[in-house]
Amino acid sequence: MSSSVLVLTSPGFASKEESLKKVFDLIDNGASRELQMIDRVQSQLVNLPINRYDSVIAAIDDGAWSSTLGPILSQAFASVHPGGTLRVYSTADEADESFEMTALLSGWLIESKSPWILSRPNQVEAVPIKLSNKNGQSASKNKILDFLKSDKENLISGDDDQELIDEDELLDESAHDNVLKVPECKPEPGKKKRACKNCTCGLREMEEHESSKTSAQLEAVKLTDTTEVDFTEKLKSKNAVSSCGNCYLGDAFRCSGCPYIGMPAFNPGDTVILAENRDKMSWMADDI
């Protein structure tokens, strides 16, 4: 049976009749040959058949082997039979540095570098091997299955009466002393619990939340004609704000727009009815 050879060449090389004739002289007389242009294979205008050729000859006229042959090495690899070869014929001196790596990544084995000949490895066939024991006797298939089955049963089946170990009993007293404890804001005996300066336990956030909640409730209070309000209650709160802060001392200490003008001084904590004050303010306005 005659061998089949694929010749891959560049258009520039194919235009040189003498160079192309030298490539054809490398092929046996009885072999069938096929000529394809490399650029047409690169652009996929031509698809190479799978496992068809016994060998491939790549004829190029430049040293940029990776850019010219690199894109088609995988297709050429698939087009030859296992054990087939690819020979590079070039008018350039030698291949560029990356061609060897490109060829290896495409699956080729490097047989020679002068001239460059690549080969496709033969197919590896799986061969069944009979198992044998130490005495040279073949191992019984049933014995192997029984052995695997017994291991599986031992793994699944467990002793329900087996006593469980308490993990805490494995620790001694020294291990309990070294347990990392979360820092807390502990007050001195007889004092209220407050957040410390570098609070990390969350107490400071809780205090700020409660304080803002109380302030919001106090701001929501609206004075009406009959509203009874403890004036000092707001002043006692942590975030209380007053224009003068001296309304309870008397008119001499009150602002010009204070609602308590005309009223006598009162003690902090006294309940003040604003309705009476409003009547006095109206009477004072009439006199003015």
From Swiss-Prot:
Q: What is its main location?
A: cytoplasm
Report the cofactors: [2Fe-2S] cluster; [4Fe-4S] cluster
Question: What Pfam families does the record tag this protein with?
Answer: CIAPIN1, DRE2_N
Q: What does this protein do?
A: Component of the cytosolic iron-sulfur (Fe-S) protein assembly (CIA) machinery required for the maturation of extramitochondrial Fe-S proteins. Part of an electron transfer chain functioning in an early step of cytosolic Fe-S biogenesis, facilitating the de novo assembly of a [4Fe-4S] cluster on the scaffold complex cfd1-nbp35. Electrons are transferred to dre2 from NADPH via the FAD- and FMN-containing protein tah18.
Q: Where is this motif: Cx2C motif 2?
A: 255-258
The answer to keyword Ribonucleoprotein applying to this record is no
Keyword field:
2Fe-2S, 4Fe-4S, Cytoplasm, Iron, Iron-sulfur, Metal-binding, Mitochondrion
Protein's recorded name = Fe-S cluster assembly protein dre2
- Sequence similarity: Belongs to the anamorsin family.
Its annotated compartments are: Cytoplasm; Mitochondrion intermembrane space
Q: Where is this motif: Cx2C motif 1?
A: 244-247
Question: What is the protein's species of origin?
Answer: Schizosaccharomyces pombe (strain 972 / ATCC 24843) (Fission yeast)
